[in-house]
């Protein structure tokens, strides 16, 4: 008698498509994945850094990266479902690389193509003196480990300011989730477009 699967797989491919930061230009991004203890990457790249991009000429002035992302995870349970953490950097008036935004989003649970717009934020100094000193020295407040963005511990005391957004597209494939008793709801409800008309 053959035993059933003991793990399920989550494969995600896609791209960090674009960003909107109205006040900034010549930006690049870094990404990394944060996941629970029962999760393990089996293939793909866990961290990456994009090229520098400039705003498109035209009305919207979008920063376009189209930077590919691909990774496969295995796990025994959905606790600690993976998140992608994105950090955006660019030059300040002195030419120093400074953080322009942090953001995170869970990878989609259901198979298929998904697009997510991630609101970005930056940490702020807690006083005017610290703000002036950090500007003068060229060292803005930033997280020593950007993965803290995906965790809740200690974030309630962090002062942040919203700044820009990043658009990411995902193509998600799962294997053996249903065999292990997890229902993502995608295969039980056919799309209205695929149902025959009476």
Curated annotation (Swiss-Prot):
Function description: Component of the tectonic-like complex, a complex localized at the transition zone of primary cilia and acting as a barrier that prevents diffusion of transmembrane proteins between the cilia and plasma membranes. Required for ciliogenesis and sonic hedgehog/SHH signaling.
Domain of life: Eukaryota
GO cellular component labels: centrosome; ciliary basal body; ciliary transition zone; cytoplasm; MKS complex
ATP-binding keyword on record: no
Record text on subunit structure and interactions: Part of the tectonic-like complex (also named B9 complex).
The protein, known as: B9 domain-containing protein 1
Cysteine disulfide links: none
Gene: b9d1
Biological processes per GO annotation: cilium assembly; smoothened signaling pathway
InterPro entries per UniProt: C2_B9-type_dom
